């Protein structure tokens, strides 16, 4: 039987070989190619699967290590918080449990990192080592963990803020022996931890955590101070916004703020019409050249000049003693233009000279013109009693009297518009003015109210005795005028009475309406107009965002905007429409 089976197996193998040999070469090559393609596809699928698994493993390892770093960071913060609370309240049982929990996990983490449970590990050093070891992996594929880079930067900045000594222990800021090398060692801590991340595990047992409460408190204050300095350094341009305007972020805004003044010099320095010379001035250097009056502000100067004939009025206006704004004595140059060395307006002693040899109120002054004011007009112009006495005394001794000129005729307004009711006496005194006015009124009233008697006394006697009847006669022109005048006076009085009543009613009605409007205005909210105002920073953003920014005349644009600037508690603001017009003009 065994021989039969062996013979059958040999026959079957021989038959297969015979069938394979019977295939043509083309069919044989196709089968070989199919087998190779199948094997290649299998290997590729296997490799892709392995790579995917490896990537997942790497991701999980990174997540685990980052979680460990974050957990240790939170534990350190919790420890600092507990120690900080000791200063404000006594320690409780819960605080003690928290500290024991932190110590236990800190020791376990140190044992896992070193391969044994001996020695305590510095938490800050472990943070640096973990961040350095993860830096290479995270940098290879940053798309996997987008938050890893941010966490690593935060941890590095947290570790850099601490002061380390040579052995890696935390040093209080008040320790003078090690504070001199704190900055250099802190800068080298990061550099040394990154390249030696593999060998740092052997030195972790030498680093110990300093748990002294006093040193931790000092360290916390130092961390807060350094954090403020770092935040201030990262604010952009390094400007101290607490001491200066927040709009001083560029030279453009600094110049534009001069329109409203700065904190150092709050006086506006915008361009004004005073910087331009007045019409009719010349720039030559002769004796009639304009006098330059320096203002206390600095650069602003006012150029004024008299005419070629030396007009006394213009010289008076351009007198430095007259326009001076200082309380000091006048300089010799100023005395040359003044009358007798008298102090000008704003200078000490100006009020004393006002009653004496004043350049404005003296009859000999160029500004005094009797032909314009009139000789008897002086007392009505200057109402001060002291000035009136002085002027009257000077008029008696120096002025020329014209007996045929009455100032009341030239200026009837000062006599209450009674020009047409005055008497023909032009030389009355001021004291008799009221009496003359009363007499003139009586004469006029008698004239308008008294009937004109007849010239024929006999006719009047006959009519009075009843012997002759009075015939109706035509009204004379004078009688007609008198009646019309009386009617007009009566009608005007009635009209005034009615108008006064209407005005009283209207005033009462207007008062009631005003009260109603006031009540409505109390509940009305005034809309804000700040939406249309742009600050300097917003204007500067518009300028710098323009593609033709390099071709813009910044100085010209700033000067144009200064003329339209408005002042607010936040600095300079400009209307958005004005800004857009100026930008279109300079960017076209």
Swiss-Prot record:
Could you give a single Gene Ontology term from the biological process aspect?
cellular response to oxidative stress
Provide the residue span(s) of the region labelled Transcription activation 1: 189-327
Spell out the InterPro entries in the cross-references. Answer: AP-1-like, bZIP, bZIP_sf, TF_PAP1, Yap1_redox_dom_sf
* Ranges where the record places region Disordered: 1-49, 164-219, 487-529
Segments for region (n-CRD): 253-265
Q: Which parts of the sequence are annotated with region: Transcription activation 2?
A: 376-477
Query: What's the main place this protein lives?
Result: nucleus
Which segments show compositional bias classed as Basic and acidic residues? 20-29
User: bZIP domain: which residues?
Assistant: 25-88
Quoted from the entry, the domain comment is:
Contains two cysteine rich domains (CRD), referred to as the N- and C-terminal CRD's, n-CRD and c-CRD, respectively. A nuclear export signal is embedded in the c-CRD, with which the nuclear export protein CRM1/exportin 1 interacts only in the absence of disulfide bonds (or otherwise oxidized cysteines) within the c-CRD or between the c-CRD and the n-CRD.
Q: What is this protein called?
A: bZip transcription factor GAP1
Q: Which organism is it from?
A: Candida glabrata (strain ATCC 2001 / BCRC 20586 / JCM 3761 / NBRC 0622 / NRRL Y-65 / CBS 138) (Yeast)
The coding gene here is AP1
């Amino acid at each position: 039987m065994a021989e039969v089976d062996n013979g059958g197996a040999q026959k079957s193998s021989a038959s297969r070989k015979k069938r394979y040999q019977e295939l043509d070469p083309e069919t044989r090559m196709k089968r070989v190619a199919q087998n190779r393609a199948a094997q290649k596809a299998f290997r590729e699928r296997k490799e892709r699967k392995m790579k995917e698994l490896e990537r997942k493993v790497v991701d999980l390892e990174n997540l685990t290590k980052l979680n460990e770093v974050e957990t240790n960071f939170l534990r350190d913060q919790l420890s600092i918080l507990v120690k900080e609370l000791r200063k404000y309240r006594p320690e409780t049982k819960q605080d003690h449990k928290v500290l024991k929990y932190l110590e236990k996990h800190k020791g376990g983490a140190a044992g896992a990192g070193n391969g044994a449970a001996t020695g305590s590990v510095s938490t800050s050093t472990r943070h640096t080592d973990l961040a350095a070891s993860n830096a290479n992996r995270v940098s290879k594929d940053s798309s996997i963990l987008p938050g890893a880079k941010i966490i690593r930067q935060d941890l590095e900045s947290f570790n850099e803020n601490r002061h380390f000594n040579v052995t890696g222990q935390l040093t209080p800021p008040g320790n003078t022996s090690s504070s001199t090398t704190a900055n250099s060692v802190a800068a080298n801590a990061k550099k040394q931890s990154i390249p030696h991340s593999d060998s740092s595990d052997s030195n972790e047992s030498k680093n110990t955590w300093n748990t002294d409460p006093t040193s931790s408190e000092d360290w916390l204050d130092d961390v807060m101070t350094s954090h403020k300095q770092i935040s201030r350094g990262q604010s952009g341009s390094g400007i101290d916004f607490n001491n200066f305007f927040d709009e001083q972020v560029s030279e453009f805004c600094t110049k534009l703020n001069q329109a409203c003044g700065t904190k150092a010099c709050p006086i506006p320095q915008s361009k004004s019409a005073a910087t331009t010379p007045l019409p009719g001035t010349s720039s030559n250097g002769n004796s009639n050249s304009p006098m330059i009056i320096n203002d206390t502000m600095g650069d602003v100067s006012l150029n004024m000049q008299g005419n070629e004939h030396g007009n006394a009025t213009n010289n008076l206006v351009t007198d430095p003693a007259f326009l001076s704004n200082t309380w000091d004595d006048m300089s010799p140059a100023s005395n040359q233009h003044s009358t007798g060395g008298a102090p000008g307006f704003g200078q000490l002693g100006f009020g004393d000279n006002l009653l004496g040899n004043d350049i404005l109120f003296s009859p000999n002054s160029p500004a005094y013109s009797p032909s314009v004011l009139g000789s008897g007009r002086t007392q009505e112009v200057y109402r001060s009693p002291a000035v009136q006495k002085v002027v009257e005394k000077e008029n008696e001794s120096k002025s020329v009297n014209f007996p045929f000129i009455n100032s009341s005729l030239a200026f009837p307004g000062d006599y209450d518009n009674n020009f047409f009711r005055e008497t023909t006496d032009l030389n009355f005194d001021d004291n008799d003015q009221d009496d003359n006015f009363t007499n003139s009124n009586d004469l006029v009233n008698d004239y308008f109210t008294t009937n004109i008697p007849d010239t024929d006394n006999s006719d009047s006697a006959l009519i009075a005795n009843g012997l002759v009847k009075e015939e109706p006669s035509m009204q004379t022109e004078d009688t007609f005028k008198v009646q019309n005048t009386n009617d007009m006076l009566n009608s005007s009085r009635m009209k005034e009475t009615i108008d006064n009543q209407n005005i009283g009613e209207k005033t009462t009605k207007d008062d009631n309406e005003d009260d109603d409007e006031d009540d409505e205005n109390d509940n009305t909210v005034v809309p804000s107009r700040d939406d249309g105002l742009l600050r300097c920073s917003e204007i500067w953003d518009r300028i710098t965002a323009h593609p033709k920014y390099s071709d813009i005349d910044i100085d010209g644009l700033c000067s144009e905007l200064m003329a339209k600037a408005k002042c607010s508690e936040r600095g300079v603001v400009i209307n958005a429409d004005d800004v857009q017009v100026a930008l279109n003009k300079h960017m076209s």
